[in-house]
């Protein structure tokens, strides 16, 4: 199966909101929720994509040859590549009923684990979303990261218990989901967390905790203060607030602020190719998350579709490393890109 075939297959079954575009840039779906769009006009999602495209790579083939080593270590686990599938929940609402959260996560989590990476899984107002995600992670031997929404503390405790029961190697919370309307309308309301509240949640995890949705140096420092083992520089794929900067724009300053602290820096938002992955690593990220294209891969080809997309990313990353003189991820440096 080729990647164009995956996209073509997805268009037949992914539903009316997502167009399975050849380039997933947020233009066709920009203001569609339900769907992969945004609650506003969607300009942040489009900016995410545009800013990665503006960054250029500095080719330099006057170097020793060899096959690049793309392995990355994260929380004591070794992964074949420095990219991970991002979290999504309620796929039958935002995409189509060709998959439920159970069948989607079964395919995604297993395929990612079998191909050397891990999947972050989603959450939702329907309790079965987290239940199904954590069951899939448990079936994959804990190779996955349950991502909990910033609910009220009682709900978080329930979700955290499910996450820990899966044997997952880390837990995440997408704090930027505070901008989703359905969270604000809850009783008691869910949403933003203080450093003190976040610290309590970190302790509940009893394993590395990842704070997803950091867009400022101040926010990164707050996450560190609360005890986070990693952050994800993220604006929720541009879904929760218009007029935000792109993740590529803020990544360098956030990575610099956390350098040497032991807190890992991941990034998402508009990253679509192995070249984009290279750019993110050059700007200071330890790894990246990619969400929407993995949804397309599942709908377009199941486990084979996921493998096809992973192989595509891996090939592009390795080729870019070779053409820029990087033999390992540690050798990818800021001077290898032009911002």
Language-model region placement:
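A gly/proline- and charged-residue-enriched helix-loop-helix capping module
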Residues: 103-152
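Alpha/beta enzyme core
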Residues: 99, 109-110, 138-139, 151-267, ...
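An N-cap/entry alpha-helix motif that binds or orients negatively charged groups
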Residues: 2-80, 332
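Short glycine-enriched loops at secondary-structure junctions
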Residues: 90-91, 123-128, 176
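Conserved active-site-proximal phosphate/metal-binding subdomains
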Residues: 1-30, 219, 238-261, 271-339
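Outer membrane beta-barrel
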Residues: 80-89
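N-terminal binding-site loop/beta-alpha segment at the start of enzyme catalytic domains
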Residues: 90-98
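Structural signal for hydrophobic packing residues in well-ordered secondary-structure cores
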Residues: 49-59, 112, 116, 164-167, ...
């Amino acid at each position: 199966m080729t990647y164009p075939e995956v996209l073509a297959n997805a268009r037949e079954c992914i539903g009316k909101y997502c167009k399975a575009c050849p380039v997933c840039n947020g233009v066709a779906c920009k203001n569609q929720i339900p769907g992969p769009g945004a609650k506003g006009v969607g300009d942040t999602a489009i900016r995410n994509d545009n800013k990665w495209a503006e960054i250029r790579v500095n080719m330099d083939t006057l170097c020793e040859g060899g096959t690049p080593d793309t392995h990355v270590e994260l929380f004591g686990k070794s992964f074949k590549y420095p990219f991970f599938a991002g979290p999504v929940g309620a796929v039958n609402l935002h995409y189509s009923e060709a998959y439920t959260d159970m069948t989607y996560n079964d395919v995604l989590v297993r395929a990612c684990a079998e191909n050397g990476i891990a999947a972050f899984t989603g959450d939702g107002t329907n309790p079965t979303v987290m239940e199904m995600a954590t069951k899939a992670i448990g079936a994959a031997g804990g190779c996955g990261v349950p991502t909990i929404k910033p609910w009220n503390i009682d709900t978080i405790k329930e979700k955290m218990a499910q996450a820990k029961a899966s044997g997952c190697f880390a837990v995440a919370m997408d704090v930027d989901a505070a901008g989703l309307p359905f969270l604000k309308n809850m009783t008691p309301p869910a949403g933003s967390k203080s450093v003190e509240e976040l610290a309590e949640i970190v302790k509940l995890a009893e394993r590395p905790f990842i704070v997803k949705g950091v867009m400022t140096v101040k926010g990164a420092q707050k996450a560190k203060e609360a005890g986070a083992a990693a952050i994800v520089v993220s604006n929720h794929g541009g879904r929760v607030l218009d007029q935000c900067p792109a993740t590529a724009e803020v990544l360098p300053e956030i990575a610099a602020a956390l350098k040497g602290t032991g807190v890992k820096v991941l990034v998402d938002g508009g990253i679509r190719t192995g070249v984009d992955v290279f750019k993110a690593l050059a700007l200071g990220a330890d790894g990246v998350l990619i969400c929407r294209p993995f949804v397309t891969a599942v709908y377009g080809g199941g486990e084979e579709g996921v493998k096809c997309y992973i192989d595509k990313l891996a090939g592009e990353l390795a080729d870019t490393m070779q053409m820029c003189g990087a033999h390992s991820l540690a050798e990818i440096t800021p001077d290898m890109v032009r911002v």
